[in-house]
């Protein structure tokens, strides 16, 4: 009897391990395929469909994503993006060492990198509470793998195609059409900054009608765009794949 029970336990263990192996293998195949194809759908997009927001998206190629929206995304979300390995270790260390009662609650303190946001949006799920902590280990893994396999250009391309930029609106192209009735490639610097300003909570911080937060944040993003535009690594990433006519114009707004 004891031998049968031990045999059953080993059998269940083998089944579970086999299931985990095939799940891991399938996820790796999907990750490699997404180096060349856009994700067919994400959990956040499924959530939009189920909630009644609909699904407005228009995936575009890297050379159709303008320099100013690339620059605005990095200026707002991850200024170290061209240089890090997927993680902002200094911010992580600072976040872990800060007394939770005294943490700076401003947006950006301990924020995820663009690479982490892509890993979360494409392969995992959104949400806080206990699900946030359950997600951390696979998020670390997928972030490491896309940095290794995709590279910076592809990560930023996917980010600017799949990130939610309004209720049911996904990607810069769909946002440009929804808010300004024009393709993303025709966006002005101010319009690009306005679209990015709705992140990370586009349902609360709306572009149209323009929330007070978006009004403030887009001006901050424009200043940051001016400050980082001449960084050689950022400039290279902003200009990659674009013709001379599509490259960023000199920022003319005033600081302040």
Can you name each region flagged by the protein language model?
Residues 2-256:
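Juxtamembrane regions of bacterial inner-membrane/periplasmic proteins
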């Amino acid at each position: 009897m004891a031998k049968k029970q031990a045999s059953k336990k080993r059998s269940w263990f083998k089944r579970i391990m086999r299931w985990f192996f095939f799940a891991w293998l399938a996820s790796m195949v999907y990750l490699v395929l997404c180096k060349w194809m856009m994700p067919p759908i994400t959990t956040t997009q499924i959530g939009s469909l189920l909630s009644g927001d609909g699904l407005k998206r228009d995936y575009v190629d890297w050379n159709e994503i303008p320099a100013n929206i690339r620059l605005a995304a990095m200026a707002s979300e991850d200024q170290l993006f061209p240089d890090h390995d997927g993680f902002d270790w200094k911010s992580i260390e600072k976040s872990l060492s800060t007394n939770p009662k005294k943490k700076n609650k401003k947006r950006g303190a301990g924020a995820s990198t663009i690479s982490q946001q892509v890993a979360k949006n494409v392969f995992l799920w959104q949400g806080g509470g206990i699900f946030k902590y359950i997600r951390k280990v696979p998020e670390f893994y997928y972030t490491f793998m896309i940095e290794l396999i995709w590279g910076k250009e592809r990560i930023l391309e996917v980010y600017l195609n799949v990130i939610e930029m309004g209720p049911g609106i996904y990607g810069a192209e769909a946002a440009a059409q929804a808010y300004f009735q024009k393709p993303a490639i025709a966006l002005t610097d101010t319009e690009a900054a306005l679209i990015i300003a709705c992140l990370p909570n586009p349902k609360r911080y709306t572009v149209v009608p323009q929330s007070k937060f978006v009004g403030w944040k887009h001006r901050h993003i424009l200043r940051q765009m001016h400050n980082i535009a001449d960084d050689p690594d950022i400039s290279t990433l902003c200009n990659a794949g674009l013709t001379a006519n599509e490259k960023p114009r000199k920022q003319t707004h005033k600081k302040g």
